[in-house]
Amino acid sequence: MYKNLIIFAMALFLTLGASAQNKREFRGAWIQCVNGQFMGKSTQQIQSMLSKQLDELEKDGVNAIIFQVRAECDALYESQLEPWSKFLTGIQGQAPNPYWDPLAWMVEQCHKRGMEIHAWINPYRAKHGSTSMSQVSKNSVVVKQPKLCFSYDNLVLLNPGLQESADYVCKVAADIVSRYDVDGFHIDDYFYPYPVAGKQIPDQALFQQNSHGYWNIGDWRRDNVSRFVKQLGETIHHIKPWVKFGVSPFGIYRNKRNDPNGSETNGLQNFDDLYADVLLWVNNGWIDYCVPQLYWEIGHKAADYKTLITWWNKHAGKRPLFIGEDIERTAKFADPANPRSHQLPAKHKLHQQMQNVKGTVLWYAQTAADNVGNIGHTLRDFYWKYPALPPLMTFLDNKSPKAVRSLKLKWTEQGPMLNWKAPKGKKWGDVANRFVVYQFKEGEPVDLNDASKIIKITYDSNVKVPYIKDGKTTYIVTALDRVGNESKGKKKKIKF
């Protein structure tokens, strides 16, 4: 009896917390390749595994996938610039057999489920620590252009101090963005290497040769990375202005002991250790969204989650702020205020309290799909029960598309189907990219701000609707442009 009361109380708590969901929210999940989940599997097995992940993530309410397509200057897509990834086929430079293009396939699969897809690259890493030099392809930049690289511990990296390195990465990015219908382009937290005790970055001579006027090597390194980030964003937007450029930095910018404006934390720092001045990029508008990786728990002694989400909310609000969440750690640790619960309810509450936090990215997709700690099902049943539109990015485009045309009900073998035509538009900002379908039962007020009335967000121009026997049902369909601006609604009343 007591156990049942606890379960009831927990469900009631979650239900109350989910009663007012955000209509716009980034709900992402990272799908990585470096964990080896694709290695040793056939094309069919990989596609089956990814399909199952995407199906579960769609049920969980995820609306964006961040898919790793470049781990070590390699490719999980057809490329003339870099070799096929060993994390796909087991051998760097070897094409998949049977042949397929994972990025092209993922674009199709994500859009079929109404999800955005963001292509994720590691910008500087040229050889992963798990890859031996004998495994490096002759077509790798490590072999073809070794002067662009330096070794550090068991890694090989493109040298951020060389403009040729920035140009090389931007060329790769331009190739991806121009050939694939991606909604976003994403780089992770690996800039200058994570420091290893007793190891020095071998760029002293380069600094002395070309310091760009800096006296301090740390300032010079930060400038190298910042100029690259700015160039990369400009490269992407020159080709496709609607592609969202995002960064997922390490979770601590600076500790307060190093900077009065830093966080009350004691850990590795973006600014000082990775030479990544993330706030400069945010405040100058060089990136379109920021996803600090806050993988710690509430109550962590060195890097408390509550301290960090509050800090990022205060300092990084000039661009949409999403929070990187570690599912396994969230499930592992109890809520300090409610020891019978994992930390998802408390973290969700913090998200709702932060004005500048516009979404979440789950680390990592497989753990959500496997429902580790019941996190995935909690999202689908409570916090992400209804679909969500992407956060607005008015700095990219602030004009809504025109309304959909010719909204009609048709009967098909699958049952009743709503069909419509996309609005006409000549410029990219006027073209409809997705559609939102709202359903209002008889007597319900028609309110497009009510997220609970969204039944589908789709890239298609049709949607199957349920057969409702009694009363009239009102459907409203709106169009979204490439950035997510929403049109006025087109209404259709139906009585079966």
Predicted feature descriptions by range:
Residues 164-172, 178-187, 191-294, 299-318, ...:
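Active-site neighborhood of glycoside hydrolase catalytic domains
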Residues 48-75, 179-183, 280, 286:
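Catalytic domains of carbohydrate-active enzymes, especially glycoside hydrolases
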Residues 423-450:
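Solvent-exposed loop/turn segments flanking beta-strands in beta-repeat/beta-sandwich domains
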Residues 75-90, 125-152, 189-212, 256-268:
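Aromatic- and acidic-residue-enriched segments that line the glycan-binding/catalytic groove
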Residues 465-487:
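Beta-strand-rich modules
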Residues 24, 32, 36-48, 119, ...:
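Active-site-adjacent "subsite" loops/lids of carbohydrate-active enzymes
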Residues 275-301, 317-395:
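Substrate-binding cleft of secreted/luminal carbohydrate-active enzymes
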Residues 374-429, 484-496:
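Pro/Thr/Ser/Gly-rich low-complexity, intrinsically disordered linker/stalk tracts
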